[in-house]
């Protein structure tokens, strides 16, 4: 197998290293002004390369201040069927495109996205409330996925292998049950399934959307893509992906963009027998419901799903507490806790718990909350009313059953968005909030005395996405590495305890209730999930 010569984009890091932070801020601020000029426009769906309107629209507002971002088509089941038919028709052509050409197209897409990175990042910040640093990092990740998967496809020669006649003769010379046999010419190839429905989340509408979509398309499948279109709307970033794919030369019909309620458009993608596979990132309940609707009805599909997390970290008595505080704060409160990899519970040895809490509260108090477009703001708004309600209800339960150590209040910013303080609390491990995914900036601190008990509690949830440890003790590191039930494990990582996977370096994979296939994004095994293996043997006379 050839080598994948891949390097990460790392835009902000490069600007800092070159002493150009002011230039970075200028480019981002200009892109924001440009993006706002387009606010209030009406947008189309794209099916088979054609603009399609639904007759009614969805109004998308920025979570920052309630400004109308745009009006998007309120697609129906019929529009989903149209998109599936268009994708199915194009599949007959796209699957036969040489893998080298497919790789070239998505390398071009990475280049086009890189040329537009600030414009796309600005739209992303306005649409879901991320800071400029998180937004540019997410666009970088989309670029990385495109280049990495192109490299993997090339390194694996399109996932096809042929057995030479001489090798075949050696293997089958004895034949079956000792009987003589002629040599066989054998080809083993991974073939695309067909049409994939890609159902994207609000929290990473660029990087995850690109990773899922390109995983399907680069391996020869076609896509019907539905961005988050209901409570948490991120439809404009999805449209930008569609537009940039076209600019990169992707044939019409390979990527079809539809918007509309999940109860109609999303459900049709799941139940329609013309869809051969589903790629989904979202809640566990939604993911399991999809599986029930398909496999339960005898409608088998390929399912590649990531279904959230309830991610733990352990802070040992042997930890560097400053590193632990830094990593815990970033993982728990970055993007207001609205990441599937966000840290939501931390188990701290009793001997250092009070010092850890004191240091954590001190650093948390310094975080600025407000308009994430401002360069000094760390925590922006919650994405929706439902997220705000979940935060308030959780704080009430903490006050009833535990101890609220810091935060828990709404924040007045002068904007119409939903802004809240990061909260730090103590609860018993058995409490429901310790086991339930919340997707808000609430961190539960739980003390422990025995390291084995800490690992046991960390594993005592339905999820298994990410986990972190802070310890300088080799025995504890070994015990944690061997015993933790999570697909992404970080040890002594000051930058973040549980978030921040880097394409090509870390795989991002969910165990237990967090995933299904056991293979993760940004890894050498991801693309294989979008294909099925076939062995073809031709006996030589």
Which stretches of residues belong to each language-model region?
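Residues at or immediately preceding the N-termini of alpha-helices
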Residues: 63, 77-80, 99, 117, ...
């Amino acid at each position: 197998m050839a080598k994948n010569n891949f390097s990460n984009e790392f835009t902000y890091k490069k600007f800092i290293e070159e002493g150009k932070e002011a230039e970075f801020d200028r480019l981002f601020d200009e892109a924001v002004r440009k993006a706002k000029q387009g606010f209030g426009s009406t947008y189309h769906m794209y099916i088979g390369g054609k603009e399609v309107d639904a007759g009614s629209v969805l109004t998308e507002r920025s979570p920052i201040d309630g400004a109308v971002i745009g009006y998007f088509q309120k697609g129906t089941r019929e529009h989903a069927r149209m998109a599936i038919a268009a994708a199915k028709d194009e599949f007959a052509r796209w699957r036969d495109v040489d893998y080298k050409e497919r790789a070239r197209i998505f390398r071009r897409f990475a280049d086009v996205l890189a040329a537009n990175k600030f414009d796309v990042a600005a739209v992303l910040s306005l649409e879901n409330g991320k800071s400029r640093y998180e937004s540019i990092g997410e666009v970088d990740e989309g670029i990385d996925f495109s280049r990495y998967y192109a490299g993997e496809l090339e390194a694996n020669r399109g996932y096809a292998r042929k057995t030479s006649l001489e090798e075949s003769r050696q293997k089958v010379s004895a034949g079956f049950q000792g009987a003589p046999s002629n040599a066989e010419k054998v080809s083993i190839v991974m073939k695309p399934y067909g049409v994939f429905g890609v159902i994207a989340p609000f929290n990473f509408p660029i990087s995850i959307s690109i990773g899922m979509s390109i995983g399907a398309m680069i391996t020869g499948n076609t896509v019907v893509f539905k961005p988050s279109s209901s409570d948490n709307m991120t439809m404009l970033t999805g449209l930008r992906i569609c537009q940039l794919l076209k600019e990169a030369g992707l044939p019409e019909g390979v990527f079809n963009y539809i918007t509309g309620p999940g109860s109609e458009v999303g459900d049709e993608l799941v139940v329609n027998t013309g869809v051969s596979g589903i790629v989904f990132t979202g809640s566990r309940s939604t993911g399991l419901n999809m599986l029930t609707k398909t496999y339960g009805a005898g409608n088998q599909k390929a399912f590649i799903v990531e279904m959230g997390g309830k991610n733990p970290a352990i802070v040992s008595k042997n930890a560097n507490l400053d590193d632990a505080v830094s990593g815990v704060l970033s993982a728990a409160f970055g993007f207001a806790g609205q990441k599937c990899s966000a840290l939501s519970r931390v188990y701290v040895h009793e001997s250092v718990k009070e010092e850890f809490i004191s240091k954590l509260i001190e650093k948390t108090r310094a975080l600025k909350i407000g308009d994430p477009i401002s360069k000094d703001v760390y925590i922006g708004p919650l994405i929706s009313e439902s997220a705000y309600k979940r935060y308030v209800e959780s704080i009430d339960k903490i006050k009833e059953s535990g101890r609220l150590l810091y935060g828990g209040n709404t924040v007045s910013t002068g904007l119409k968005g939903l802004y809240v303080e990061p909260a730090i609390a103590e609860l018993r491990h058995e409490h429901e909030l310790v086991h339930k995914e919340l997707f808000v900036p609430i961190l539960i601190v739980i003390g422990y005395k025995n390291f084995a008990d800490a690992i046991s509690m960390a594993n005592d949830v339905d999820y298994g996405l990410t986990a972190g440890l802070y310890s300088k003790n080799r025995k504890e590191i070994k015990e944690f590495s061997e015993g933790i039930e999570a697909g992404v494990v970080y040890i002594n990582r000051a930058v973040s305890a549980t978030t921040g996977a880097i394409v090509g370096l870390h795989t991002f994979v969910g165990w237990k209730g967090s995933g299904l296939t056991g293979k993760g994004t940004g890894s050498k095994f991801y693309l294989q999930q979008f294909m099925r293996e076939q062995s073809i043997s031709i006996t030589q006379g």
